From Swiss-Prot:
GO terms for biological process: formation of cytoplasmic translation initiation complex. Residues 193-271 form the RRM domain. One of its GO terms (molecular function) is translation initiation factor activity. RNA-binding component of the eukaryotic translation initiation factor 3 (eIF-3) complex, which is involved in protein synthesis of a specialized repertoire of mRNAs and, together with other initiation factors, stimulates binding of mRNA and methionyl-tRNAi to the 40S ribosome. The eIF-3 complex specifically targets and initiates translation of a subset of mRNAs involved in cell proliferation. This subunit can bind 18S rRNA. Keywords: Cytoplasm, Initiation factor, Protein biosynthesis, RNA-binding. It is found in: Cytoplasm. Pfam families: eIF3g, RRM_1. It comes from Drosophila simulans (Fruit fly). This is Eukaryotic translation initiation factor 3 subunit G-2. The gene is eIF3g2. GO terms for cellular component: eukaryotic 43S preinitiation complex; eukaryotic 48S preinitiation complex; eukaryotic translation initiation factor 3 complex. It comes from the Eukaryota.
């Protein structure tokens, strides 16, 4: 006659192959109950009942495929999910994946709202240059450059023969006679408003030269000396301005001016034979 085990004590005393009864589980509603048996540190048999709440959630396809992987080793015959005998569940780590827009918004909130990132190029204050209270005054470098240019132009018009300033020969006394003699020799070029800009970098281009001098005044011709083989700048250039006062302003403003990590040298162009 077949005997039935009716109490937990009878289950413990039952003769099993490994000394422990098999684990069993059943589902009731949204809960899953798992009953297991094991030996404690004192060598005694204990019964462990675990309760799981069943929740349904939508997971990425990669996660669903990973859960269907075939188990191997000691877990070859295990059911889906972790096995307490071979798997130890550590601290649960929650990860949240956000898009680039959400990251930008989060990063902006971490910035110090009291710190002003604007810096004025005129007075180095903590505001934008367009809102600078010193804009248009002597502290403005652009205004200072325009002031120097206007002063140099006025000086060139009022006193062209001032000591220390180069004056072309045809503007000196008797220059007109000399100029008329040389007219038939091909010297019909007017260099009175030409300047020579030296100490230029090798990477200088015609566009850079145009940007350098266009704010001073209109010019009629430019020449940038280049190496024949490499095509690099030789270090000097000539600019013919339309008006002599603009040429004087260019010398006053650009001579000694830092450009491309070099100090420019600007002077009147010497007459060519």
């Amino acid at each position: 006659m077949k005997s039935f085990i009716t109490s937990w004590a009878d289950e413990v005393d039952a003769d099993y192959v490994d000394g422990l009864p098999p684990s069993n589980e059943y589902i009731k509603g949204d809960y899953k109950y798992v009953t297991e048996y094991k030996f404690n540190d004192d060598g005694k048999k204990v019964k462990v009942v675990r309760t799981f709440k069943i929740e349904k959630q939508i997971v990425p396809k990669a996660v669903a495929r990973r859960r269907n992987w075939v188990k191997f080793g000691d877990s070859r015959s295990d059911k889906p999910g972790p096995n307490s005998q071979t798997t130890m569940a550590s601290e649960e780590i929650l990860m949240q994946f956000i898009g680039s827009k959400e990251f930008d918004q989060t990063h902006e909130t971490q910035l110090d709202p009291g710190k002003n990132i604007a810096k004025c190029r005129i007075c180095n204050g903590e505001h934008w240059s367009v809102n600078c209270p010193y804009k248009g005054t002597s502290m403005d470098s652009k205004t200072m450059m325009e002031t120097k240019a206007n002063a140099a132009a006025a000086a060139a018009i009022s006193d062209p023969s001032k000591t220390g300033k180069y004056v072309p020969p045809f503007m000196k006394d008797g220059g007109g006679i000399s100029g008329s003699k040389n007219w038939g020799r091909g010297r019909d070029r007017d260099d009175s408003s030409a300047v020579r800009i030296s100490n230029l970098s090798e990477s200088m281009t015609e566009t850079d030269l145009e940007e350098l001098v266009k704010k001073i005044g209109p010019h009629t011709k430019m020449y940038l000396a280049r190496e024949k083989n490499s095509g690099l700048c030789k270090g000097f250039a000539y600019v013919h301005f339309k008006f002599r006062q603009d040429a004087a302003a260019a010398i006053e403003v650009l001579n000694g001016h830092g450009y491309d990590h070099l100090i420019l040298c600007v002077e009147w162009s010497k007459p060519q034979p």
